Amino acid sequence: MAANVPPSAETLLSGAAAHPPKTAEEIANQYDLLPKLIPYLDRHLVFPLLEFSSGQDDDKEVVRAKYELLKHTNMTDYVANLWKEINNSDTIPDEFVKKREEVLAKLENYQEESSKITELLQDEAVVGNLRSDKVANLRFLEEQHGVTLDMVNSLYDYGRFQYSCGSYGTAAELLYQFRVLSTDNDKVASATWGKLASEILTTSWEGAMEEVQKVKESIETRLFNNPLGQLENRSWLIHWSLFPFFNYDPARDVLTDLFFSPAYINTIQTNCPWILRYLAAAVITNRNRAHKNSSAYQKQLKDLIRVVRQEGYEYSDPITDFVKALYIDFDFEEAQKKLGEAEDVLRSDFFLVSAADAFVEAARHLISESYCKIHQRIDIKDLSTRLGLNQDEGEKWIVNLIRDTRVDAKIDYKEGTVIMNHPPQSVYQQVIEKTKGAFFRTQVLR
């Protein structure tokens, strides 16, 4: 019988004390996606993520990780300096000196091999005679200027080598020149991925978005009869697209639409459900931009809710849990709790740190909008708590909300309440509205 006695208050309190709330650092570590992201990124694209970790993790471990990441590249001077830092030495082994000499010799050789064709492609008179037909272009250059297929391929090899050396701007130009002339579909596809990476690493976001579109088209056409290849390549493109997603405002709508398209949302659900974090963050922060197209935003939100509900058993974090609490469970207390955790996750995520403030702002708006829709009289202190604000901050927030959204409401400062002037309804209208509300919740949950 004793085993069935409910626990005392003291036992419950001591249990709570044994499990104190997690710190921001613990939450960030628990939901760190770096191990999930790395397999889908080129090693050069991983480097900025490790740089971001330098201020958060053990610096020695990060330095060692950078060394392991880049030791097989041709960034010889940088790798040598990492080795010196790891080994606390002022000198480097002879193997680094030898590799540096080999890299310089290869650079000189590639430059000589490609000098003729690069000079021709910088000549306006020559470029003016080029057309969209690659075969005709190559024939023209061969007949008029003695260009060979080996010379064209040297642009590809030289571009890849420059990329391996960390000269991303030069690599982008060489790979572009190669792509203009080559009819080798596999190499052209590889060059397009290389140019996308180069544009990302030089933060040329407009150019990166052009390459995202080219890679997407290549996946659809070149891998048309290879569903597994399409799945893998789409997974890579989704991860690479995260760089412009949150760094270039014009990319936001384009990539949100891409991620929600049938082929790509299926890829996310099948292969990389953790991308829901970034999709959710994009949709929530898009609330601040909703004036551009409110109906489009509502569709994004509805699509997000549907996917979060479907994938709840496969993946969740405080960002997706916030969506679940607010729009699936209609639990305002849980939504406020998850918003606090989400902020910690956002500030520790390389891609989302710059969107953290916008996310919190938009999320508070969404909580308050939902809360105001279902309450006639709102206690300012209670709503402030749900928004993670003190009473003074909450009061200012609500004043701004009423002003910005033009809702019909007034604040009773004496009582500390907001009175929502929902229009009076007939019994018939109340039945209709309740039916519509039930229908809305049903639609959201589908």
UniProtKB/Swiss-Prot annotation:
**Transmembrane spans:** none
What are the record keywords, sorted? Cytoplasm, Initiation factor, Protein biosynthesis
Q: How does it assemble?
A: Component of the eukaryotic translation initiation factor 3 (eIF-3) complex.
Gene Ontology MF, one: translation initiation factor activity
Q: What does this protein do?
A: Component of the eukaryotic translation initiation factor 3 (eIF-3) complex, which is involved in protein synthesis of a specialized repertoire of mRNAs and, together with other initiation factors, stimulates binding of mRNA and methionyl-tRNAi to the 40S ribosome. The eIF-3 complex specifically targets and initiates translation of a subset of mRNAs involved in cell proliferation.
Compartments, record wording: Cytoplasm
Under InterPro entries, the record lists: eIF3e, eIF3e_N, PCI_dom, WH_DNA-bd_sf
Which organism is this protein's natural source? Aspergillus terreus (strain NIH 2624 / FGSC A1156)
Keyword Secreted found: no
State any GO BP term from the record: formation of cytoplasmic translation initiation complex
Q: What is its main location?
A: cytoplasm
Q: Which GO terms describe its cellular component?
A: eukaryotic 43S preinitiation complex; eukaryotic 48S preinitiation complex; eukaryotic translation initiation factor 3 complex, eIF3e
The family line of this record is: Belongs to the eIF-3 subunit E family.
This chain's protein is named Eukaryotic translation initiation factor 3 subunit E
In this chain the PCI domain maps to 256-425
